[in-house]
């Protein structure tokens, strides 16, 4: 019983009123649709894994992924020791095929630190755009830029569009700018409400509405990706050879896709070769500390340290770096692939953060 938490959540969605001309509008205070959800959350992943690896389950279970490390913490969460382990080197020559670095200061001297307080400042948002403009001039073809949340992504892009930086970035780089549509978040991004509010995608209680909204989200994502790939192909076609950038005089020199960590773009889509010659990660993708799932999981782990569980803080930190590993892996999809990885946050320069970064 101690592995579960019973949670009651109440969410609201503004009620819309229809006008005589067929239009609809939302009236503040006029009424809100409320939905109540009763959930039983299992906070111990070992409960589910026991069905696979328990005494009466499979005789052999093999887990393979590029983001399982550190293996001790993974084994702790699943409650299995895994007596046979292997951490293989990457299939690419990291010294020759990858350039990776962390940047803590923008071109005009602004501190690049994606904490809530700093990220709300215009100086941060503007210099992040200035830095991205410089990087995308040098990185050929396709560039992926990952933000820790939709809220920060929306805030930054709104600022860039209002100041003209969005258009200036396109003009300076010759790259078309694209943004991942909302509703594609997974994991804690989806549960926290950071990606579109707790009533987003049809509300928590609306089964059919939720399904229709997800279908629409998928269609929007597919349409956006088709345009992104088309822009990259145009750039590759203009290049003197596949590994070279398009000429600076060519009007179509690639594309930039702004997306969120833990979204479909960062975890579920393959961007091989020219589709991702560079990956930029903005900030450190910690889960939303105010999300109830995160809060309860941290408490649960703190209570279970004596049983060999990670502490709540250790678990919380590793969620960020596993998500980071998924995102940066978008630019290295096979042994002949190559690309640049830029971590746009001064915290990545600290020793206590560097030791968590992938090899």
Each PLM stretch: what is its role?
Residues 1-359:
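ASCE RecA-like P-loop NTPase motor cores
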């Amino acid at each position: 019983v101690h592995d579960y938490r019973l949670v009651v959540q109440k969410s609201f969605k503004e009620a819309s009123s229809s006008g005589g001309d067929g239009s609809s509008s939302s009236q503040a205070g006029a009424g809100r649709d409320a939905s109540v959800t009763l959930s039983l959350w299992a906070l111990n992943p070992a409960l589910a894994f026991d069905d696979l690896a328990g005494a009466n389950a499979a005789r052999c279970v093999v887990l393979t992924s590029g983001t399982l490390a550190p293996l001790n913490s993974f084994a702790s969460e699943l409650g299995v020791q895994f007596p046979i382990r292997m951490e293989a080197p990457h299939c690419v020559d990291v010294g020759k095929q990858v350039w990776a670095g962390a940047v803590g200061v923008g071109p005009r001297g602004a501190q690049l630190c994606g904490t809530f307080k700093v990220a709300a400042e215009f100086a941060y948002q503007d210099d992040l755009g200035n830095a991205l403009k410089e990087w995308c001039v040098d990185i050929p073809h396709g560039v992926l830029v990952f933000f820790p949340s939709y809220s920060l992504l929306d805030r930054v892009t709104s600022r860039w569009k209002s100041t003209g930086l969005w258009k200036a970035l396109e003009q300076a780089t010759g790259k078309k700018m694209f943004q991942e549509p909302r509703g594609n978040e997974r994991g804690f991004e989806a549960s926290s409400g950071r990606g579109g509010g707790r009533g987003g995608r049809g509300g928590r209680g609306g089964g059919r509405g939720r399904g229709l909204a997800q279908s629409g989200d998928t269609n929007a994502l597919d349409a956006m990706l088709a345009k992104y790939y088309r822009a990259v192909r145009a750039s590759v076609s203009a290049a003197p050879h596949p590994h070279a950038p398009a000429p600076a005089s060519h009007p179509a020199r690639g594309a930039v896709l702004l997306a969120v960590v833990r979204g479909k773009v960062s975890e579920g889509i393959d961007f091989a070769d020219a589709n991702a010659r560079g990956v930029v990660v903005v900030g450190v993708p910690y889960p939303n500390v105010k999300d109830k799932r995160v809060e309860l999981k941290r408490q649960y782990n703190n209570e279970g340290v004596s049983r060999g569980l990670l502490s709540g803080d250790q678990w919380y930190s590793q969620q960020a770096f596993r998500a980071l590993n998924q995102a940066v892996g978008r630019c290295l999809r096979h042994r002949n692939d190559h690309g640049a990885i830029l971590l746009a946050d001064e915290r990545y320069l600290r020793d206590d953060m560097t030791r968590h970064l992938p090899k």
